[in-house]
Amino acid sequence: MNQKQPPLPVCIYALFHPKAKESAALARSIFRWFRLKEDAEQGTTAGLPVYYRTQCKDGVTSPEMDWSGAKHNVVVVLVDDEMALDEDWRRTLGKLIERAERSRATPGVEQIHFLPVMVDKSLERLSILSQPIRIYSQTDPIEPPRPSTAIPADAAVQGAWEVECKRIQAARGRLRERRLRRSLTESMIRIMRGIDPKALPPRLKVFISHAKTDGAAIAARIRDGFAAISQLEPWFDQNDLPPGFDPFEPMVDGARSTSGGMIAVVTDRYPTRPWCRYEAMQARTPRELIEGGMPWTVQPTVAVLVAGSTWTRTVAPLAQVHRIGWPSASLARPSPDAHRSDVAAAARDWIALDEALQLRLREDECIADVVDRLLLEILFSDVFNRYVQRMNPDGRIILGFIPDGWTLANIKLKGAASRPREILYPGHRLRTPEQKELDTLVSGIFGEGVRVRSLEDHALDALATAGAGDTGGIPNAGAAGTVRVRVALSAGGTDSELWPAGIGSCHIDDLMVRLTRQLLSRNYYIAYGGTLAELDQPKNLTMSLLDAAEGWRSTSDFDLEPDRQPDPVNLINAPPVRNYAAWPNDQKITSSHRAQFLGLCEFISVEPQAVMDPDRKKADALTEMRTKMASDCGVRILFGGKIHGWSGWLPGLAEELLTSHEAGKPVLLLSGFGGCAALLAEYLKGAGGLPLALSFSDELKHRDPGEWLKPGTSRQDRQTKYQSMTTHLERIYAEYHDGTSRIHIIDEANETAAIAVILATLSRLFPRAAPGGE
């Protein structure tokens, strides 16, 4: 389709040297922060686009940055020793600075904002870089001296030194990541608000709403903690106003429309105080940015939840506000009757002191989290408001926040639209139970037939309609009485192989999860193969996919209408996700795991029975797994993928393409996300000749022959497999060029556009796919 989208308000490019490990880690942290991957609970907000650039030549990055894709292009340059020593990068940075200055001097063109980051002292040697974001500090913790080599190394001492080094490196990394994300967020708020980067930026005022009876001390602690770490200026009562000022209007205005937002310290007494409720109401009462127009917005607000011992209730206007818990004070205090000479009493004093210090540190961490999250809410509010002001309402209500009963009722009372045809909220589609709750609220307030959906779904339909001439957008997997299609998803890749495409493995994982949500909510099943990683680890791709299956499957076991609740037996027998695991990784899946995900994920183990050599058995198991997966699934989607260092006989995505072709199944091949999939697409669209990176000789250069070429997987065996792959790919190439192939190459490099093409292609391939069966 290659449908050109209108420019976004902002796009972020993180530039770093491919040899710089710390800069690469910082780039990943930028992606996680602005794509909201730190959110464990919702995961529905879309975030901001973040891309990488690690290569340059002749003063230009590769790939080149698309300045036309956003009104404001923020170029974050992670400057360290490797970049400072690279002549190509120095030349490129000079040209980028010149272009950024020209863009700011030319009204009406896309703006380029250059933000250098001081990762180490090398930036001080580059005179072309000024006003850097300083995340490096000489006071940061450093590794302890290595144990002396003059005497035989003690294993225990060496081990303790290595553990301590890792701990300090991790702590230093977290410290610098936090500095970077806060400074970047503050800088981008100034950019969105048009503040001159050379001028002294005004401090953003933040109102702290709290109950004086049990929240004043915590509110003061938060206020005092702000000064050391941010450019926010907090205030919360008449003591922060000049003498003689009536506090009513400033405090109401503070809750409703201060430049920086509001923090609600929700203690046990907070819901019982009329003034607190009034402040919450003011902050969360929607208002139109443009009178008689749109969008509807609310004050950026976060909540600090202080759990006490009193029964209490919630506050309705704060139902959809992001919140974090305040650290509890569970100190082991010594008995007041203990004698100071008593050793046990002294020990208790020490423990109490240590716990008090730890509590103080946890409070500091919480305050930092509150500052960072509020800054992010302010930035997202500014970005979203700019984005939707270009949209045509056309009978819609467009919201800049996730709605709840309070906000929807207020919009209705203000007479925005007696009966809108549609209500749009920001971000990705809500989880199925949340969406059903929202559907019920909207029906009760605005009447039956008013559709409520995410802006992502709206954008997907708009892209599909513009690109495919489809007048109805993207349908769900369709008509009753037919089968439900299982879609095989195959992706992956290593950072170093994906960086040339301007992305990393985190982008691939993000696309995998977003695509999974869309497919599940549109009545498709999904399947994926490979290792499940460690199921007991809280953060990994597998758990993200299973979370998507639980939250976004269309046949949720949660339904507000009892007569529509699905048969629980069918839910167990037809789980939305299927995982194919090849030997020996399938041995990691225990009965406990299978029971834990019963009705959600079916685990298929694949183990060749007639093979004795373990190395050959591993390779054969992967081939057999991919063959079975191709046979069981109706279509396969390929993107990313390892080029070198894969497991099995052949590159994983290449073998998956071959097995799906052999099974006569259609394949959607995404070329815009790098990796093996991009090489395969390049080959099929080109003039012939397999890419060198997919040859046996090139793979051998990236391997330890002693590990890769073993008795069960000998050189002759592997060369034979490669020759077979080449012959098969040549056959696919011929079919692709004579128009008989079932390979569909999708060239979109933008996630939303790629998903739109995928969904539109699936609806054409399977126009009568529907729930029930496979």
Short names for language-model regions:
Residues 1-77, 192-193, 201, 205-211, ...:
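Hydrophobic, helix-prone linear segments
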Residues 98, 224-228, 253-254, 281-289, ...:
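Short, surface-exposed basic-aromatic patches at helix termini and helix-loop junctions that form
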Residues 202-265, 271, 388-429, 487-496, ...:
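Conserved small-residue-rich
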Residues 117, 208, 234, 262-263, ...:
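Residue-level detector of buried hydrophobic side-chain packing
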Residues 28, 32-90, 102-108, 122, ...:
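Acidic/glycine-enriched connector segments
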Residues 29, 92-96, 179, 183, ...:
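Alpha-helical scaffold elements adjacent to nucleotide-binding pockets in ATP/GTP-utilizing enzyme cores
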Residues 19-20, 55-57, 64-124, 212-213, ...:
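Conserved beta-strand-loop-alpha-helix hinge of the TIR/SEFIR fold
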